[in-house]
Amino acid sequence: MDRYPDENGYFGEYGGRFVPETLMPALEELEDAFKEAREDPEFWEELEELWRKYAGRPTPLYYARNLSRKLGVKVYLKREDLVHGGAHKLNNTLGQALLADRMGKDRIIAETGAGQHGLATAMAGAALGKKVEIYMGAIDVERQKHNVFRMELMGAKVHPVKAGTQTLKDAINEALRDWITNLETTHYLLGSVVGPHPYPWIVREFQRVIGRETKEQITELEGGLPDAIVACTGGGSNSIGIFYDFLDDEEVALYAVEAGGKGLDTDEHSASLCAGEVGVLHGCRTKVLQDEHGQIRPTHSIAPGLDYPGVGPELAFLVDEGRVTADAVTDEEALRGFVMLNETEGILPALESAHAVYYVKKLVERGELDRGDVVVVNLSGRGDKDVRIAAEELGVEI
């Protein structure tokens, strides 16, 4: 299972390091630090204690009995929405903040879309005494004002990025510029399984805890493995996080659900696995949404955290290999999933996670899941941050 990435950071034809020469030493330093930390039991002991006492792991695997009754299959929710801060993001930020410690870096920078990764970085920085600066697209700053306020409360400085499309892609560009200027003192804490090697590998290793716990929990609850696992996919850290420990279990179907926006037949979506082509984005070769001139296409999703024109190289590889199935759910369907989980279980999912929730209904309708099949949905985050967007879309004034 640990075949990939290879020593050059490739997953098949995807991955690698497409960055300015000036960044190479920092990436090599990071790779060396991680290789060393990965073999050090003390590093994992410290991280596991933080996961346990600060993040609140392990998260429960919850049997959604009302939703199950409604859909005719057994639906379990991996409750990453219960992690401190409200999403799976903290699993990774705590790990990388500890790595920054090992490298003697006292300043951390990060990009954020929905604000969840920015928030998780601000939390890890506050907990471990680091100076934190966050780059966030101006449009996202507007959409997620309360997350910006929370980051600032935790001592982080938030830079609204007004360049380009003013979303996640541009925030990443600005963060990379900052890093190039401040390599000595600064660790760039990337929030997903994207970017140049070793990031896709590092982030996967810190998010694997989701799948490890799930495997143990579902075996205990059901006496075996699930028939399917479903996770929403933007960059892909929550999906690879839950999929990874099941890759060798061929009988478990793995579904990566992308943001279909206003439909794959429009230009307003963020489904790079479904509709992208091979290209280079933010330092790695992967599936990218681009126009006929190879320019990155503007993306759209009701869920800010899925609004990204690329995807992790490992997921692109696994889809090509046929181990993971990529599909998409539209804004409208995600909204239905959002309402459905609230109504049946009293659980408010993030709009990102609502894509995965609704997809189970699609699988049942298509006959890809039979009555009584067991499916695990990675509930990657909670929806407090999305109440305003959802209310607006549902025609309710708050």
Swiss-Prot record:
SUPFAM superfamilies: Tryptophan synthase beta subunit-like PLP-dependent enzymes. One of its GO terms (cellular component) is cytoplasm. The keyword rRNA-binding does not apply. It holds the Pfam family PALP. Disulfide bonds: none annotated. The keyword Amino-acid biosynthesis applies. Pathway: Amino-acid biosynthesis; L-tryptophan biosynthesis; L-tryptophan from chorismate: step 5/5. It comes from the Archaea. CDD domains: Trp-synth_B. It is an enzyme of class 4 (lyase). GO terms for molecular function: tryptophan synthase activity. It catalyses: (1S,2R)-1-C-(indol-3-yl)glycerol 3-phosphate + L-serine = D-glyceraldehyde 3-phosphate + L-tryptophan + H2O. Its cofactor is pyridoxal 5'-phosphate. Keywords: Amino-acid biosynthesis, Aromatic amino acid biosynthesis, Lyase, Pyridoxal phosphate, Tryptophan biosynthesis. The modification N6-(pyridoxal phosphate)lysine is found at residue 89. Its EC number is 4.2.1.20. Tetramer of two alpha and two beta chains. Belongs to the TrpB family. NCBIfam families: trpB. The beta subunit is responsible for the synthesis of L-tryptophan from indole and L-serine. This is Tryptophan synthase beta chain. It comes from Methanopyrus kandleri (strain AV19 / DSM 6324 / JCM 9639 / NBRC 100938).
